[in-house]
């Protein structure tokens, strides 16, 4: 990809899954990469897996002060942040009628408020510097209806509209896009689905499989590169054809 060598990239939720694969991909492209994650064991594991990292920083993204401190530390480690991969998120599989106020608040706080905190702090930094790219992890859950994830779905739809609004306000200095993966075989997915459930999902996807985290990472790398210099305000699905069929593919 053109223009990624030497870019300073901060990946949130970067200790596992899509985040870890994305951190690895940017390192392959010659970027300087810092990973943000709240999980201490995860941060230690990713440091061992990717020794070329510029560093790791800790933060609960739902806490504004922690986000500010972590972003400042990432800037200290790398000198600046040119690209933000705003990826941290959680999900809970539960029936809509049984969602507690505490569960609702937790998912909203991490997946939407946390994305806003990180995006706003990074955007101020980038506007001051005159350029930057913010890429956010949405989901096909924010595009199609899915049962048992009402709170998660609401946050991902929110991320999509936040992305569009940011792109309009931050242009021309800062580009903002979202990536909306479909089913991705990540540790979070494995924890929530049995083997039988995973296979049932595969049969609903036209390509008959889950995405690999590395495939999502490749799209992030492209969108951050000079090859995508005219891309902003867009949501890019990578879902094996899932949304092409709408309800028919569910």
What kind of feature is each model-predicted range?
Residues 95-96, 103-108, 134, 201:
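Substrate-binding pocket helix/loop in short-chain dehydrogenase/reductase
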Residues 97, 144-150, 208, 226:
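Active-site loop immediately N-terminal to the catalytic Tyr-X3-Lys motif
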Residues 119, 155, 163:
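Active-site helix of classical SDR
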Residues 124, 167-172, 229:
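Alpha-helical segment proximal to the catalytic Tyr-Lys
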Residues 139:
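Residue(s) in the substrate-gating loop at a strand-loop-helix junction
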Residues 144, 232-250:
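Short C-terminal tail/terminal secondary-structure segment
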Residues 178, 199-227, 231, 238-240:
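C-terminal helical subdomain
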């Amino acid at each position: 990809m053109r223009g990624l060598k030497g870019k300073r990239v901060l990946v949130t939720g970067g200790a596992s899954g899509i985040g870890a694969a994305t951190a690895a991909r940017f390192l392959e492209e010659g970027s300087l990469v810092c990973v943000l994650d709240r999980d201490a064991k995860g941060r230690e594991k990713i440091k061992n897996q990717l020794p070329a990292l510029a560093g790791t920083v800790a933060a609960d993204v739902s806490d504004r002060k922690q986000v500010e401190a972590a972003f400042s530390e990432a800037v200290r480690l790398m000198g600046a942040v040119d690209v933000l991969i705003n990826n941290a998120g959680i999900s809970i599989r539960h029936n809509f009628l049984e969602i507690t106020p505490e569960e609702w608040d937790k998912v909203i706080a991490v997946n939407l408020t946390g994305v806003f905190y990180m995006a706003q702090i990074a955007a101020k930094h980038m506007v001051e510097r005159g350029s930057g790219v913010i890429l956010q992890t949405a989901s096909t859950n924010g595009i199609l209806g899915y049962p048992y994830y009402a709170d998660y779905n609401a946050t991902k739809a929110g991320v999509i509209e936040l992305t569009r609004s940011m792109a309009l306000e931050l242009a021309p200095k800062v580009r903002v896009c979202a990536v909306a993966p479909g089913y991705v075989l990540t540790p979070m997915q494995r924890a929530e689905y049995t083997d039988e459930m995973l296979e049932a999902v595969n049969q609903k996807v036209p390509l008959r499989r889950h995405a690999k985290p590395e495939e999502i990472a490749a799209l992030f790398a492209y969108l951050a590169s000079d090859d995508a210099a005219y891309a902003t305000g867009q949501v890019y699905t990578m879902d094996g054809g899932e949304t092409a069929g709408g309800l028919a593919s569910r």
